[in-house]
């Protein structure tokens, strides 16, 4: 399943009423003003996680599984996440389901703004959540931890991508106890992937990420694992096989005095 879906294709799915769950990842304050018909509202921006210790990951997995169970996802369910544009919370939703080996997942390219511009219907009523115990199998190959990164900093076959702004990367915008970035990380602001609310073409994305060796292990991070999820999706669309997201991101790394930083 492609990681992106266009408005036209999603509209056809809503008409067929097939086994597709549409998840609006925006805050309820935006959802209630209008959303895609049938969409469930789950504000994924509330699911920050800054502890990637063994215990922390165990708790993250348990709590995320509980959250996904409220959406009613079965093995055969197609899941479409969206936010206002091809943004960070929809990408986080895609990453979450891939973490649980659920590959029938994508995000709406252009998000709700594109859906509305294209003239597709909008509804105001809320749709009830439908519980179904989510049983996805964890895929640790796409999740990075702080300890894993620290052990691998000298590995030439590792590329770390900092998806934050230039100001956060160089330390002039401080959002943790310490400023700066993870040593050796390259800075590619996630916003450079987006044009008029949509992902740029694969040709343009390929040029953006041309300095990343195809065979390297790539780890993306940001402040809280959302912008990094967007870059994760972009890299997967380009065919990179070994991509992980560091969910703790700078919210964990920048607040741990035992970890190295660069400015």
Where on the chain are the PLM-derived regions?
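Cytosolic catalytic domains that perform sulfur/thiol-centered chemistry
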Residues: 1-263
